[in-house]
Amino acid sequence: MLKITKIKRKIMNSIKIKLSLIANLIAIFALIVLGIVSFYFTKTSLHEAALKNQTDLLKVTQSTVEDFRSTNQSFTRALEKDIANLPYQSLVTEENIINNVGPILKYYRHSINALNVYLGLTNGKVLLSQKSNDAKMPELRDDLDIKTKNWYQEALKTNDIFVTPAYLDANLKQYVITYSKAIYKDGKIIGVLGIDIPSEDLQELVAATPGNTFLFDRENKIFAATNKELLNPSIDHSPILNAYKTHGNYNFFTYGLDGKERLGTCTKVFTYTACISESADIINKPIHKAAFIQVIIVIVVVIFSVILLYFIVSKYLSPLAAIQTG
């Protein structure tokens, strides 16, 4: 009789283990499927959030460039208006122009900290106020051949302000952006106003923006960046430029740089190309962290479920065991 009882107990224990195993396998499978689905949506959500963050950072840089241009254009219009509002007699002779326009040019140059502010006359001479020669009042010069300059010619072609791309000024030996505007009085051309702003001003504004953003000029050279190491002309930026040409404005792409995968996006801002780039590892780091946390949670839940289900199965099979032994 004792032997039969032991056999029955072994059978019941075997049933408990098998039922517990089946229940646990079902639970484990369900938890794994749930974990995979949850991770997929978490990964998608985190990835989209990372891309949106990068897009927002690039838009900050775009707004910075647009505000920089808008500020300088407003300044140019204000100066044009002050000169055009002078009595016509103040603008008919070179001496009158020097005496009446000269102080205005110097005042405006000081107010915006420009490198040069000048008025190119139709006879080829230019009234020039220079930061490098601040002690002197603006003087009239005829050795700069202004009629051949792009800022002079383009300003005469348009009724609006002409803005040059950043370029290396041969006299200043530094990169500048020129804002120019033709000035008319009573329907007659007085001259072309020019303002040279150092591109360093834009560089400082871009450097203060968040994210790894940078600006290419029309020759595809970086002249402004949050990371000044990118200004090194020896760095090959063709991978990101080629990827941008393929994908277009505000479309993300991956590219290789120094053997590492990077994620980037670009957009046109006037004549510039503004880009933001980040290591794919940095973008994926929160995703991998979330995956690790979810794996730990699934393992803990599986272990807890195995133990819990075993005791539940044991409890509900206990009456059956008592009947069989009784």
Question: What annotation goes with each model-predicted range?
Answer:
Residues S20, N24, I28, L215, ...:
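Cytoplasm-proximal transmembrane signaling helix
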Residues Y179, G191-P198, L263-A290:
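Short, hydrophobic beta-strand elements of compact beta-sandwich sensory domains
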Residues H110-S111, T122, L128-I197, L202-L205, ...:
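Extracytoplasmic/periplasmic ligand-binding sensor regions of membrane-associated signaling proteins
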Residues W151-Y184, P210-F214, R218-E219, D236-F270, ...:
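Membrane-proximal, non-catalytic sensory/regulatory domains of signal-transducing membrane proteins
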Residues I98-S111, K188, V192-L230:
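Solvent-exposed, extracytoplasmic
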